[in-house]
Amino acid sequence: MDAYTARALSVLEGLAISGDPRSHRDPTTEATMSIFAMRFNSTTSRPVMGRPQRGKRGVITSTPQRCGIRDLEHHVAFVMPGYIQNPQTLAILARDEIPYTPSTFRRVQRYVSARMIIQMCERNDMLTPHYEAVTSPGVVLPAPAGGGPRCYAISATTLQIHIDPMQNEVLTPLIFPDQEDVIMAEFIWQRLANGIDNNAVMNMGTNVELLRDNAAVEGGTPFMATPRGIHVVLASYEPVNLCTIHLTCTRYWVTGPPRVVYDSMEADILAVYTYRDGFWDALRSYVLQALGMPAHHYPTRPVTEFRQNLAIAILSRLFDVYSQWRLRSTLQLRPKVLWWLAHRLQAALRAFRLGR
């Protein structure tokens, strides 16, 4: 079935460039479109042509809709209400004589393997979820009752660490929570010049440094560290004064599914979630909601299901075909371009605000 889906994507891509009568298609695309048009035209009263003439826009836009929706129906039991599908579309796309491009087949392979792929993913949210409360920055707090380092969270990503005079503190177990999926993180440390102790402002010690594998790290310079293998130590050389630093985690990496499965996925997502007009907004919203995806924004978590990734790929190519022929039809209405653009902007804002 991978070849069947690759043929459907190849046909949609070929139909997208058919809007330009001067386009020069590669041999594979030319053969795909020729054979598909020949087989498809024998099963319908609305034939599709390789170079559609003026007035045939309804044919060229309904053909990719049939291919895309039929592919979704085959893979995910998707049903489009009020739409009568050509039952021969599936049989035509399943014929071995219709070629497909290597790029489309490679993308289909990525859709299938998405749920089994694990890679190093960058994140910048809260690294220290075990800190349930935060304290005010600069306030000197006593050591914990049970002993241990004087380390407190002042934000979701920043820790405030006190160190007594002439002491060393190993920071690796403090800055990396006990999470198996954390691979490495990037930090920035800064020395606190003064703080508040007993309702009075006091100067903090200045002779303090942070060591990464026994090498000094300059304050304000980003450095990388790992939970295992790299030792991060805070050393105080002050004879009397207390030293305090702020350690901020700017980003970290964990193992998880990738957000981008194939090469053109980011461009496809942008095309799918672009407001074109009311018809496209309704079609896109219905298909995505039927597959359990948001209608007006891409999911915040990575998409690993084959059917959802396939829907993104198919809808993006339907958007290319639809935009190509809608653009050619609206270019004839030049005196009304400004009114048409203002109307589209108002409709887009209304659709996104209402969350249709």
Curated annotation (Swiss-Prot):
<keyword id="KW-1152">Outer capsid protein</keyword>
<dbReference type="InterPro" id="IPR023176">
    <property type="entry name" value="Orbi_VP7_capsid_N"/>
</dbReference>
<keyword id="KW-0325">Glycoprotein</keyword>
<dbReference type="Pfam" id="PF00897">
    <property type="entry name" value="Orbi_VP7"/>
</dbReference>
<feature type="glycosylation site" description="N-linked (GlcNAc...) asparagine; by host">
    <location>
        <position position="41"/>
    </location>
</feature>
<comment type="similarity">
    <text>Belongs to the orbivirus VP7 family.</text>
</comment>
<comment type="function">
    <text>The VP7 protein is one of the five proteins (with VP1, VP3, VP4, and VP6) which form the inner capsid of the virus.</text>
</comment>
<protein>
    <recommendedName>
        <fullName>Core protein VP7</fullName>
    </recommendedName>
</protein>
<dbReference type="GO" id="GO:0005198">
    <property type="term" value="F:structural molecule activity"/>
</dbReference>
<dbReference type="InterPro" id="IPR001803">
    <property type="entry name" value="Orbi_VP7_capsid"/>
</dbReference>
<keyword id="KW-0946">Virion</keyword>
<keyword id="KW-0167">Capsid protein</keyword>
<dbReference type="InterPro" id="IPR023178">
    <property type="entry name" value="Orbi_VP7_capsid_C"/>
</dbReference>
<dbReference type="GO" id="GO:0039624">
    <property type="term" value="C:viral outer capsid"/>
</dbReference>
<dbReference type="InterPro" id="IPR008935">
    <property type="entry name" value="Virus_capsid_a-hlx_vir"/>
</dbReference>
